Structures are given as C-alpha cells and as structure tokens.
Amino acid sequence: MSSVVVVGTQWGDEGKGKITDFLSENAEVIARYQGGNNAGHTIKFDGVTYKLHLIPSGIFYKEKTCVIGNGMVVDPKALVTELAYLHERNVSTDNLRISNRAHVILPYHLKLDEVEEERKGANKIGTTKKGIGPAYMDKAARIGIRVADLLDREVFEEKLARNLEEKNRLLEKMYEAEGFKIEDILDEYYEYGQQVKKYVVDTSVVLNDALDEGRRVLFEGAQGVMLDIDQGTYPFVTSSNPVAGGVTIGSGVGPTKIQHVVGVSKAYTTRVGDGPFPTELHDEIGDQIREVGREYGTTTGRPRRVGWFDSVVVRHARRVSGITDLSLNSIDVLTGIETLKICVAYKLNGEITEEFPASLNELAKCEPVYEEMPGWTEDITGVKNLSELPENARHYLERISQLTGIPLSIFSVGPDRSQTNVVRSVYRP
C-alpha cells in the first residue's frame, strides 16, 4: 500500500495540478476529495495544454482510475461539459468513477451564490460564483441532493420540488430575484445524470480495495490550506476542507491508510480574492512576478495578488496538514530579481510572533519580518537536479526548507512537466 496526498500550502494556485499530473505517472488511482469546479488545473500533456476544473488530473492516463469523491460538490452541467471537452480532444474518460454520495450543484445554488455576493458589496468574500458554498450549506442543513438522488427521477423530483419552495422564497423575498420553476431544472439535470450514470459507483469501495491490493493511490486536493474552512483565513475561505484530514471524510478512506502528504508551494506567494495578505507586493517587483509567472486565475481570469514567500503561512500548513514533503514550484519566476525576501515571522503590536493568527483583525495588523537573500540571473529552466542550480538559488531553496521544517522532495523550474525534478520519492514505503 502506498498513499500520497497532495495539498496546497498557501491560498491555492500553487501548481497542484501540475504536481498531481507529474505524480500520477507512478500512481494507479487518482482521487479528488473536496471542492468542485471552483478549482482550476492547467495541465500540459503530450505538448497540449488542457484546463480542467472538476475531473482529476490523472484522466489522461487510460490505465489509471480517476475518482470524484463523496466530499466533492458536482455541477452536473459543468461535468458533462468537461467530459465533452475531453472527448473532443480524443481523451478517453472510461477510467472515471464518481461517488454516488457526492452532492450536486443545481441552478439555484449558482443564483444564490451570485446574489449573496452582490448583497455583501464591500464585504464580499471573493467567491468564484460556482455555487460551491450554497451546495455545501444544503449538505450541512441535510437538504442537499446527492448523485444517487439525481439518478432516480422520482426521488430527484420530490427533493427538487421541496427545495425550490424554500429557495424561491429566499430569492424572491430576500434578494428580490426571480425564482425557478421545477420544469426549468428537472428534465435537463435528470438527463445530465443519465449521461454520467455509467461512471457512478461507491468510490469508497474502489479506493479501499485499491489500497488493500497494494496499489498506489494519489489524493488530489483543491484550493489550499489557507482556504480551508477550519484552518484558513476565515471567512475568506472555501466551504470545504482542503487540508489532508479532508481526505478521510471526502473519500471514505480511514486515516490509518494515509502515508505521505506533499505540500505544494510557489517560491513566492499568490492569492485570489479578498482578505489580509501580509507579504503582498504593490510595486514593480510584484508586477514583474505577476507577468513572468502568468499569475491570472484559471477559473476566473482575475489577476492574482502577489507577495514574497511567507514561511509563517507554510509552517501553519505543515502543522495542520501533517506535511511530510515539500514541492516548490515556479522558482524560475524569481530569476533576475536582485534581492529576494522571505518572511520569517510577523510583528504584531510591537512583538514578534511565528504563529499564524486566527483573528483577521490581528492578521491585518501583522507586519512581515523579512530575511533578505541574494537573487540569481542565470537561466535555470533547464536544470535537472539541485547541484545544477546557481548557488544563490540552491541556498534559497535550502532556506525555505529550513524555515518551514519540511524536507524538499520536488522542485520545479518551469510550467512543463519535464521541468519538474525529484529530490526524493514521495512513494517511499
């Protein structure tokens, strides 16, 4: 048995899709366990760039099983669209399995997400408006519709009718927005269910059987630890648990079966949406990193906020996710910057702290305490191992590993999977 979890150590967009794709080569099963199509993965495979939002990155390997776990919320329309996108590019999806326990995103979730964000105005969270939060709200309120319900027309119609009474009242009375008729949703979404029916199984059985048979299973997290609803910068977070602990809940695999946790990080920090960001850059260096690193959201196209590497954030991620291996991406983006900075602690009310505060008011007052390191000018995009890196680049990586307390296992010097280098295997016993 060999199981590896891939999590983002920052606010998402760390390059998890690329690393998951890279690690998928040696995995036999690849599973997602939380989130929905609010996550964006850009993957290069055989010279072609693909953008996925819902389906696991391992779909390009025909012999590997790809799982959409029970902890996810699935937009059936988006799923059918993504399947068609892959089929048009001659990518087989026969290796996909979808949990019958996953919850379903319906049009009223999308509408509620949109109108609630508009209502908040200046206090908005920065949601992707994909209906993720409202779907998880229904799940917690025990009125959600699951994939198993979607496949049974009678059950689907009954639950949909009951939910529409409440949702329409909410939309019309509170938001002064138009509600939905049952016929607007029922036939269309039941048909989506029929189109994906062949993929639907109890994925907990699939995953546990694979592990019991000694197969390599890779769990793919979406977003990042700092967007975790419990451990992140609440309320500027997602509605699920991207931390490694989310695997056991969102996949139906027990905690004793998780072996290694890979924390994926950029060599700097980015963030999409609102909320405090202690190391954020508002200068030419920030603009340079954004443009060189093409820091624009895969899902939204929004420019990402950019800042220096924050070891306080990544240490927090290591602790709450039990990270055993560090994968450091986008090192090449920093080439040409004369002096690099790493945040080693925060200054709060005149005192130094190395812990990440729970209070956003406190976080907003935190000033980063920086350690400066000399940069490098050499082209590193063709580097294949640590010894080939310029001395300053190697020292930068070593310092990040020291400050975060996570051994470096993978480093990446460009967007292509061939620019990903292994220092030590994450599939070790």
From Swiss-Prot:
InterPro entries according to UniProt: Adenylosuccin_syn_GTP-bd, Adenylosuccin_syn_Lys_AS, Adenylosuccinate_synth_dom1, Adenylosuccinate_synth_dom2, Adenylosuccinate_synth_dom3, Adenylosuccinate_synthetase, P-loop_NTPase
Ligand binding (Mg(2+)): 13, 40
Cofactor remark from the record: Binds 1 Mg(2+) ion per subunit.
Parts of the chain that traverse the membrane: none
Active site: 13, 41
Protein name from the UniProt record: Adenylosuccinate synthetase
Cellular component terms (Gene Ontology): cytoplasm
Organism of this sequence: Bacillus pumilus (strain SAFR-032)
Co-factor(s): Mg(2+)
